[in-house]
């Protein structure tokens, strides 16, 4: 038993198990509403319509909220592997492997071979990275860009190859195409602060191709911005002012064209960071300096190595501390630096500034919690979906496909469900009007109606009596089919029917 536990705590073994678990979830877990399925459906529409410039929120409705890099990645997978979970997620996962490779290489160069494995295993075991590493969202693409920039800048300052300098600007271009100017705000201030504290401005000026690198960055990112504004005028105003200013400064911002604001108290991002890095953040609890002088020695040693990791880890969180409209994925850019710090504390030598050896992050307890989390994610996603924090319409769509006959149709009543659009490849209708349900029931062919259970009382009784239950999924959606033994409803005005209960 001890041998098994010891092997599971070995960083390469733990990393391999976690990646296999994530790959299994990538293939088997359904797309959930609203975020992941929304981006997956946008990518599917991109392939269907052949419009790779303007992402579409609905057919003919531009999606201005985010640049298209992550949607390009998903659309490429759908183009190659079909409209399924694997196709829409695989290149997001490839991007995550790129992040792990960058983090492992940086830790290996700075701290040794073992530290590279440790940093990669710790990062993969953090719940926030584990989820985002194959989720169809924009966050992983942004992380790839910021990590490339930060790792390559550190490499260039240590006398690395010339491509390291160009990697800084390539990372910024990736970030601009993933989430826009936010990539610059996340990457450049910690670099500037590090240069200011260490005084290595001249080295930075000599080590980086500032002019040609900037040209490369603009050549990679600017053409899409110009093409998007030309194709759908008004994009730049909404994207730059709305998404990059009002979203973070206006509590409960109502200008979001594609969703709802997420009002939170200032400082909530620190809670998200702790939850997103648990349990590995516990490895920092005893990493307290014995004195300010000892901390300075450690932080400035090896060309300011410790200071660089700290600034990289703290800045994304500090920047969003006053923000009133954030979601739980916002601490993600800080996690690679946090993983490298933990890898350093995991080493056999203890930094001189620390009073005593820190607890090794790859302890049986931390590794066990991480593996339990991964196992629970698989069990919930595949066997207990009603316990999942987010729901999917995949089971309902599969049931409809089994029940349907030629000429049958499905209409969704209630909030828009992007996963239903993805799994039917756009082959459903959506309405919030009970009158539309009545019209479809009077049309030729058999009608299936899907709706959340709590929307059923909103359907007038004459309409509801024509629906026969097919299946329901706990507190989630329910599927109904048109009854064939009811009289025709032509001539009934649903708007004039009595409310439920009368």
Predicted regions and their residues:
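Hydrophobic alpha-helical targeting segments used for export or membrane insertion
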Residues: 19-24, 215-219, 371-373, 377-386
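Signature aromatic-anchored transmembrane alpha helix within multi-pass, membrane-resident enzymes
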Residues: 347-379
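A detector of low-complexity, intrinsically disordered, Ser/Thr/Gly/Pro/Ala-rich segments
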Residues: 52, 136, 482, 495-498
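Membrane-integral, polyisoprenol-dependent glycosyltransferases
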Residues: 2-354, 421, 459, 475-476
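Short periplasmic/luminal acceptor-recognition loop of GT-C membrane glycosyltransferases, typified by
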Residues: 373-484, 494
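Compositionally biased, proline/threonine/alanine/serine-rich low-complexity intrinsically disordered stretches
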Residues: 489-502
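Extended hydrophobic-aromatic, low-complexity segments
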Residues: 327-331, 342-343, 348-351, 362-366, ...
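Short, charged low-complexity linker/loop segments at the C-terminal edge of domains
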Residues: 348, 486-491
């Amino acid at each position: 038993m001890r041998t098994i536990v010891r092997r599971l705590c070995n960083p390469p073994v733990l990393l391999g198990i976690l990646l296999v678990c994530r790959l299994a979830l990538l293939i088997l877990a359904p797309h959930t509403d609203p975020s992941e399925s929304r981006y997956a459906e946008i990518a599917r529409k991109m392939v269907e319509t052949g419009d790779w410039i303007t992402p579409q929120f609905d057919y003919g409705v531009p999606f201005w909220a985010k640049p298209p890099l992550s949607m390009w990645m998903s659309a490429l997978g759908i183009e190659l592997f079909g409209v399924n979970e694997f196709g829409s997620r695989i290149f997001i996962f490839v991007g995550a492997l790129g992040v792990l490779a960058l983090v492992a290489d940086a830790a290996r160069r700075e701290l040794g071979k073992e530290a590279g494995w440790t940093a990669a295993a710790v990062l993969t075991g953090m719940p926030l990275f584990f989820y985002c590493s194959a989720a169809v969202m924009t966050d992983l693409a942004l992380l790839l860009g910021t990590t490339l920039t930060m790792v390559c800048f550190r490499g260039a300052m240590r006398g690395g190859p010339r491509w390291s300098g160009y990697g800084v600007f390539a990372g910024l271009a990736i970030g601009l195409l993933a989430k826009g100017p936010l990539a610059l705000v996340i990457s450049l201030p910690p670099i500037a602060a590090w240069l200011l504290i260490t005084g290595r401005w001249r080295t930075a000026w000599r080590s980086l191709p500032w002019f040609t690198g900037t040209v490369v960055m603009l050549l990679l990112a600017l053409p899409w911005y110009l093409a998007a504004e030309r194709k759908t005028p008004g994009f730049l105003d909404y994207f730059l002012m709305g998404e990059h200013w009002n979203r973070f400064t206006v509590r409960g911002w109502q200008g979001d064209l594609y969703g709802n604001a997420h009002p939170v108290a200032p400082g909530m991002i620190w809670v998200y960071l702790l939850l997103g890095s648990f349990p590995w953040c516990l490895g920092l609890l005893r990493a307290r300096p014995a004195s300010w002088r000892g901390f300075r020695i450690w932080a400035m040693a090896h060309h300011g190595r410790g200071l660089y990791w700290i600034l990289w880890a703290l800045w994304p969180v500090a920047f969003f501390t006053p923000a009133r409209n954030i979601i739980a994925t916002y601490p993600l850019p800080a996690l690679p630096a946090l993983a490298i710090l933990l890898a350093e504390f995991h080493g056999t030598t203890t930094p001189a500034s620390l009073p005593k050896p820190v607890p090794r992050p790859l302890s049986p307890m931390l590794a066990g919690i991480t593996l339990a989390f991964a196992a629970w994610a698989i069990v919930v996603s595949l066997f207990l979906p009603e316990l999942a924090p987010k729901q999917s319409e995949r089971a309902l769509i599969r049931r409809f496909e089994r029940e349907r006959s030629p000429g049958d149709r499905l209409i969704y009543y209630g909030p828009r469900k992007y996963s239903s659009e993805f799994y039917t490849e756009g082959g459903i209708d959506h309405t919030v009007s009970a009158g539309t349900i009545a019209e479809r029931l009077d049309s030729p062919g058999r009608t299936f109606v899907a709706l959340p259970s709590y929307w059923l009382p909103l359907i007038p009784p004459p309409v509801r009596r024509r629906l026969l239950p097919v299946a329901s999924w706990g507190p989630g959606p329910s599927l109904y089919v048109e009854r064939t033994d009811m009289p025709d409803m032509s001539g009934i005005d649903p708007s004039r029917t009595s409310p439920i209960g009368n």
